A protein has these predicted regions:
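Generic alpha-helical transmembrane segments of integral inner-membrane proteins
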Residues: 56-64, 86-90, 167-174, 255, ...
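Inter-helical loop and helix-membrane interface segments of multi-pass membrane transporters/permeases
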Residues: 1-2, 15-71, 100-124, 191-195, ...
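Membrane-water interface regions at transmembrane-helix termini and the short interhelical loops
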Residues: 1-10, 57-81, 143-151, 236-241
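Hydrophobic alpha-helical transmembrane segments
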Residues: 52-57, 213-214, 247-255
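Membrane-interface helix-loop-helix modules in multi-pass membrane proteins
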Residues: 1-36, 143, 160-181
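Membrane-embedded translocation segments of transport machinery
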Residues: 75, 79-224, 228, 241-242, ...
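Membrane-embedded helix-loop-helix hairpins and adjacent transmembrane boundary segments
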Residues: 209, 251, 258-270
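Transmembrane-helix boundary/entry motifs in multi-pass membrane transporters
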Residues: 1-11, 28-32, 39-52, 79, ...
Length: 270
């Protein structure tokens, strides 16, 4: 059905991006950002065969977590990492807004351009944000909802998810977009902005090496917790339809997603 296909399609795309995050976490540990041109570093990686091993690693981590049943451990770690991410965001926000020309980015975010409301692409991008950010693609929420305890206040939980999702997105926008203006980057570049703007900010701040590691580690936990949802939902649908085992369903879905995403690996950010 459509919700299942949509969550699988998201899983296909998301695996590529999680691979990028793993690569940048590794690069932040090595301190690569301090010795290279950051934009060229990204362009030499994204859209090339170099992404394949990181994408493969992302898929292996995801299926291992699902099959070994260590999701509870990820949830417990997220109770630490997600608040830590908000603290890191706050520090980065303060540093970003003190960069030269950053206020132009703030104006870009806050001054409305009403004519864009009449352009279909605006609504498509807004739906895409909801689609990815809040997982409003049906199946994932249904599968996770089936695991809830009977006494969970679902409307209140949903409200909290929406609020914290919106707050984190707004914080990220006020870090990345002003940062893009400060370093002369195109604010409409899309997902690649995270991987170009943030290393620039880390280079320009005290203890940037440490904050870079913590930032990308937090993003890994956020990304893994999301992609687990996508695999769980897709594998659950496969199990129900083909009456097979959890292991087989998870393996087939993961393998199919990786293979389908190879053209994305070789073309994204190009």
């Amino acid at each position: 059905n459509i919700p299942t296909l949509s969550v699988f399609g998201t899983f296909v795309f998301y695996g590529v991006v999680v691979g990028w995050v793993l690569k940048y976490f590794y690069a932040s540990i090595k301190g690569d950002f301090y010795n290279v041109d950051i934009a060229n570093y990204f362009n030499s990686f994204a859209g090339t065969s170099a992404t394949l091993k990181w994408h493969f690693l992302a898929m292996v981590i995801t299926i291992v977590i699902v099959l070994l049943g260590v999701i509870k451990g990820i949830e417990r770690m997220n109770k630490i990492m997600m608040p830590a991410l908000f603290v890191i965001f706050t520090v980065l926000l303060i540093r970003t807004l003190t960069l030269p020309n950053a206020m132009e980015g703030v104006k870009y975010l806050l001054i409305p351009r009403w004519e864009y409301l009449f352009k279909p692409i605006t609504w498509v991008m807004a739906l895409g944000q909801a689609f990815f950010s809040a997982s409003l693609n049906g199946a994932g929420m249904v599968v996770y909802g089936s695991y809830l305890k009977k006494d969970v206040d679902i409307p209140n939980a949903a409200l909290q998810v929406a609020i914290f999702d919106a707050v984190s997105a707004i914080l990220a926008a006020f870090i990345i977009i002003p940062g893009a203006f400060a370093f002369g980057l195109d604010p409409t570049s899309g997902p690649s902005l995270l991987f170009i703007t943030m290393p620039h900010i880390f280079k320009a701040m005290p203890f940037g090496y440490l904050f870079g590691i913590l930032f990308f580690l937090s993003i890994i936990f956020a990304a893994i917790s999301s992609i687990i949802n996508m695999l769980e939902a897709s594998a659950d649908a496969y199990m129900s339809f083909f009456k097979t085992t959890r292991f087989k369903a998870s393996f087939i879905v993961t393998a199919a997603a990786f293979i389908i995403a190879i053209p994305l690996d070789l073309s994204m950010a190009r």
